Swiss-Prot record:
EC top class named in words: transferase
Gene Ontology biological process terms in this record: lipid A biosynthetic process
Keyword NAD tagged: no
Domain of life: Bacteria
Protein name: Lipid-A-disaccharide synthase
Keyword set, alphabetical order: Glycosyltransferase, Lipid A biosynthesis, Lipid biosynthesis, Lipid metabolism, Transferase
Organism from which the protein derives: Escherichia coli (strain 55989 / EAEC)
Amino acid sequence: MTEQRPLTIALVAGETSGDILGAGLIRALKERVPNARFVGVAGPRMQAEGCEAWYEMEELAVMGIVEVLGRLRRLLHIRADLTKRFGELKPDVFVGIDAPDFNITLEGNLKKQGIKTIHYVSPSVWAWRQKRVFKIGRATDLVLAFLPFEKAFYDKYNVPCRFIGHTMADAMPLDPDKNAARDVLGIPHDAHCLALLPGSRGAEVEMLSADFLKTAQLLRQTYPDLEIVVPLVNAKRREQFERIKAEVAPDLSVHLLDGMGREAMVASDAALLASGTAALECMLAKCPMVVGYRMKPFTFWLAKRLVKTDYVSLPNLLAGRELVKELLQEECEPQKLAAALLPLLANGKTSHAMHDTFRELHQQIRCNADEQAAQAVLELAQ
């Protein structure tokens, strides 16, 4: 940043979640430095905030080994071109938003040229492939972390890291309105309500839906008024779930929802879900939950040897204890899942204690992440 040149921030986002983060960061930076320039790889939200897109985000948004191999030459070309063009531009700071396989190497290339680099959103190095932390440390001047235990991990390896809180915690109210959510979904206020969230990936829906449906059948025996809501992320997952339900529980009445996962969580007395970001969202919705997860035996065997954490769900990792029940592999079966959910549906001491802890954890990670990220960028730019 000079008197002649405005503050120039280069950014690369590789998927929709990164585009949302990038847009929030740009917005917060523009409030402080209205004439700042933003360039790089951007999605529609970042572009709407004024980011100049050298490449469209969709160019990087490839998933799966086969897809990546098919696009490898193009991806390597883009990374080489960005290394050259950012090297010539000499931005005040480069921010790589998530997409670690693409961004961390790019960050390293730019850091060697004297450009200050930030990696926004820590990869799960604390959970597996922990040696990646050394590459991240060499490639970046700063990591921006959503969760406090991530910062503790980086501190252990002397890698500069700033805990900024989680954008999802900023976006969700501390005290959600359950009755308003029920009105939206058409659920009576006095009914018992269970949310089933069998995952967003095809493999998860295939592995979990049958057990989740059988669990709901068992719970309906105890709670005949039980309303069951099943939010599904897209038409493919809905079609897949409907096929499995027709085979396993054709007579079980459920509310199938297109998206609306957050509304389903807020409306429900309890949720049965696959692990992942959904568990964090469910915690922020203050919905007591049980995590059920199953994968192919070899994958599970491998995961047990690679994963270095005691828990798989983010609420438990945040709490540092088994706050929510995790039933994995052979434990993920209808009788055990139903037994774990029954006390939560009763809305007694168990669910009230869980709700209170969820609220405390929400407050811990509700730090105005966009503003914190913007402050970190400006401090590094000076």
